[in-house]
């Protein structure tokens, strides 16, 4: 089967990183909307997607944000999967996903990088990678959750092309995102 969709598109890849509740998902939606308005196909991918799928089966989580078992997800992802099974488990899955989706999408947005290697490995592997650091408020986490490695590993990591401080209205945030995207080629 041949056609445009079977040719690798060499997509722009955005790697979004920041603490929980900093606005990563909202910013991702703005990026998708921006490119879709230019008739380009955009998709968001999450390192945490497989963890969430495991949680749905293991503890019958309903998948809703309001009932998110954050402690369980942190333990499953770090203590079991990264520490006991494969330190690059999620990165390898993401790289495989990028390879597949590169045939179908012009823009790929990784919405939830939490560790240095989750940013650096895609950055080194692909040609058009834009790293965006998000700073915002994560005050609704417990102290234990705030101290988890997935919340602290990037505290002193400042490798990025763009930084967004999410401290205003949604309209202001959208303007910040659009200004960045106007610069990206």
List each model region and its residues:
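Small-molecule kinase domains that catalyze NTP-dependent phosphoryl transfer to phosphate-bearing small molecules
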Residues: 93, 123-125, 131-185
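Short, Lys/Arg-enriched N-terminal segments with co-localized hydrophobic residues
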Residues: 1-5
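ATP-dependent small-molecule kinase phosphotransfer cores
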Residues: 43-105
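Post-Walker A helix-loop "phosphate-sensing" segment adjacent to the P-loop in P-loop NTPases
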Residues: 33-43
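P-loop (Walker A) phosphate-binding loop of NTP-binding proteins
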Residues: 19
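Hydrophobic anchor at the beta1->P-loop junction of P-loop NTPases
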Residues: 16, 110
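Conserved lysine of the Walker
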Residues: 24
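Hydrophobic positions on the alpha1 helix immediately C-terminal to the Walker A/P-loop
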Residues: 27
């Amino acid at each position: 089967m041949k056609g445009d969709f079977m040719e690798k598109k060499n997509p722009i890849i955005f790697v979004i990183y920041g603490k929980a509740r900093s606005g990563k998902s909202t910013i991702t939606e703005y990026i998708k909307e921006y490119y879709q308005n230019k008739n380009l196909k955009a998709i968001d991918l999450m390192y945490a997607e497989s963890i969430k799928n495991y949680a749905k089966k293991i503890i019958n989580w309903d998948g809703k944000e309001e009932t998110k078992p954050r402690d369980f997800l942190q333990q499953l992802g770090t203590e079991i999967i990264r520490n006991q099974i494969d330190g690059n488990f999620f990165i390898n899955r993401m790289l495989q996903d990028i390879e597949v989706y590169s045939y179908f999408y012009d823009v790929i947005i990784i919405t939830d990088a939490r560790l240095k290697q989750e940013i650096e490995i895609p950055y080194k592997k692909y040609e058009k990678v834009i790293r965006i650091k998000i700073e915002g408020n994560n005050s609704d986490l417990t102290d234990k959750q705030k101290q988890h490695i997935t919340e602290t590993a990037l505290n002193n990591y400042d490798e990025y092309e763009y930084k967004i401080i999410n401290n205003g209205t949604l309209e202001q945030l959208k303007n910040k995102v659009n200004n960045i995207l106007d610069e990206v080629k």
